[in-house]
Amino acid sequence: MYAHIARARFQPEHSDDVIQVARDSIDAYRELAGFVRVTHLYDRASGWGFALSTWQTEADAKAAVMPLASVTDRFAPYWAEHPSSEPGFFDVIGALPTFEVVAES
């Protein structure tokens, strides 16, 4: 399995909106080939959010990036700072590589 990690900082006063977008995005992930799971993590106080998506193959993980760009766009109104990564990714520091999942419980 392989995983993508995305992180972004949102406006804390829009926490409820950010959480709703995350919840609404689940179906978009489920429609994609090789999808295993997605976990959205969020800290209401700081506005930091993380998404960890897991995919069957590295090719599946990489192929999911552009189809999920619409999910990224739905988060945009709530960013505290505009992500500085390549299209299809959202990350305030830079796009992270696709990781191989080497242990899980």
State where each predicted segment sits:
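Short S/T/G/P-rich N-terminal loop/turn motif that feeds into the first structured element of a domain
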Residues: 1-49, 56-70, 77-105
